[in-house]
Amino acid sequence: MSRLIFLNLPSTLNPDTFRKTLLSPATLKSTTITDTKLVPKRRFAFVGYKDAEEAQKVKEWFDGTYAFGGGKVKVDFVKDEPLKTGDKLNRGEKSKEKRSKEGRDNVQEKQEPNKRLQEFMSVMKGVDPAMASPEASTSTAEGTKKEKSVKGKEKSEEPEEAEADDDDAAWLRRRQAALEGEPSTPQLSADEQLILSTSRLFVRNLAFITTSESLSSHFSTYGRIDECHLPVSQTTGEPLGTAFLQFHNAEDALAAYKALDKTIFQGRLLHVLPGRAKPGQEGAAAGSGVVDGKVLGKRDEGRGEVKSKVDAKRKQESAKGVNWASLYMNSDAVAASVADRMGISKSELLNADSGNSAVKLALAETTVIEETKKYFEEAGIVLESLQPRVPRSQTTILVKNIPYGTSIQSLTDLFAPHGKLTRVLLPPAGTLGVVEFENHMDAGRAFKALAYRRLGNAVLYLEKGPVGMFKSETAPGVGPISTEQKREEEAKALAEKVESLPEQPDPTDEAGSTLFLKGLNFTTTTPHLQTVLSHIPGFSFARVQMKPDPKRPGEKLSMGYGFVGFKTKEAATKALKALEGFEIDGKSLEVKFAQRGAEDDRETKKGGDAEGGKTKSTKVLVKNLPFEATKKDVRELFSAYGQLKSLRLPRKAVPTSTGAQSTRGFAFLEFTTHTEAARAMEALKHTHLLGRHLVLQWANEGEEVDIKGLREKVKGEVRGMEDGGDRKRRKLDFKGGKEDEMDGLEV
């Protein structure tokens, strides 16, 4: 309820004075008015606000006051409960029906006189001379009796005739007639049929402050939204107050149309209409049928037409999600970049006689990725945001598969015709770029126009950048950065890094002197916890356990518990008794002694293994290995970052058609130290080997045992396949004996 109605306003009030009065209180200056409709003659007005909280503040301030110079003003919320569909359609029909029924009743009353009046008139009327004679009366009585007997005879004969004709066929005919008279199911209107065919809605009368995120959030309660498009003016760049919403399911679009039409959103009354299909998609929306054995909408197409349709479909699907790794780079560009730096040709770099070409290319890609990540960090990009499940921005585009030698000027010239650019980033290797637009409309237009477009000898792969990708909104490189500004930024970054480090216990503290605090308020921070507990005797440290925020990259969330350490175990015991039930930020604490290493185990289970320091394992599990990879390839690739103690590359038990046993697509590596394993995981987590992205994670100790068990199981299955007779005998053992016991029969 973000729309208010003001009653009992003075009739001399004008719109400008009314608006100024609404914004005059200091507490209401920050409110956003989205719509005002003043009707001075009727002394009321409608005012729309951005959200219900602002409307509530205004209502509490002006309700029952004399702020507008007239009588006492009454302020109330405008109800946005729309009439039901049946009431909308049948209200007029019901009123007409009621009036016509009343008219028929009046006519019927006029046509049917009162019975008592008729009886009175017959008594008061004189006797007819013809009826006074005895003969006439006798004949009249006989005629009356005769008529009564005839009528009685007819009435007695009707049931017999009905019973005679009441056979099954007649009953069925009457039943069918009754069914035909029943009301049929309501047919869908033309608007509803259009929505079911396109899954698209057109929304009007939006506030100019409406964003695609807020509108999508409002409509997404009825189903998944694939696209939200807010048109803007080509000259001023201001929104037009309209929007197009593309739903994933047509039923969800129809439900949103019925529920949200004529409702209030951000202080304005929405007008929801069915949206037409996008240009070029009318055929898909119209559906298809079969006539004379041929499918409508299909014809004999040439190879070129089919290829163009496939390309168009690929471009359309590319805008819906993440199709490539965020740091994907063209292998040819990587090789060219490294070869250029070394002063050699690509053929010399990838010479098969001098070493493994696949491993060389993978190591070169790893080097280029490290340089690119360092460049992006200096440019203010949050690397943690480059995850596939992070929400996507509407103004940032990642440009991948760029050929080597592309300059930042050529990249700017490619995207600038589609709109105003905020920033363009291109690392020294020139294999991955970032382009940010000022307007999401321009970014969408550029994405559609340049996706899968050829640039040099490569095809561009575009991906929408993640939300919160940049640390600051200001674009880097706008002006020369002074030495003082650079020092301030370095000092600020160092301070943030120091603050993010967890408090470590003093090595001189006794064992068992750390307490576990459960039930902390999620708003409680580590500095606040230290301030509250620092007065306790023997206090050493205090910290709130944090985890990364998946919705806001670079920020952290409280996990609702923490730890406090003391110098001695005796001090910890006294603090345990004092802190039990103690309230911090309105939450009562539950305190107990912490178990050594429990917090690390808890972090490993909940937080994952992203940083490597949360587990001390030296074993790494490598997934998504190409089946062509050999032990030599894997050993050469990983031995560049540490010494390997063991390497296991499981193979399939059943040989292929060529007679060789192919790998199963994963491997187990064991390094000498945990530091080497962590360094290898950090360096190779974005690397490709033979075109496949390597997926690295810490291996649990029990996984190898499971692999051995699976291997024994597969061996048993293969042995059973070879010994088919034994399997048949085991299937025929109906007495429930052991499978391995032989029954003495020979096959």
From Swiss-Prot:
Keywords: Nucleus, Repeat, Ribonucleoprotein, RNA-binding, rRNA processing. This is Multiple RNA-binding domain-containing protein 1. CDD domains: RRM3_MRD1, RRM6_RBM19_RRM5_MRD1. Pfam families: RRM_1 (PF00076). Residues 2-80, 199-277, 395-467, 513-596, 618-701 form the RRM domain. Signal peptide: none annotated. GO terms for molecular function: RNA binding. Residues 157-169 have a biased composition (Acidic residues). Its main location: nucleus. GO terms for biological process: rRNA processing. It comes from Cryptococcus neoformans var. neoformans serotype D (strain JEC21 / ATCC MYA-565). Involved in pre-rRNA processing. Belongs to the RRM MRD1 family. Residues 83-117, 129-169, 595-615, 718-747 are annotated as: Disordered. GO terms for cellular component: nuclear speck; nucleolus; ribonucleoprotein complex. It is found in: Nucleus. Disulfide bonds: none annotated. Residues 143-156, 597-614 have a biased composition (Basic and acidic residues).
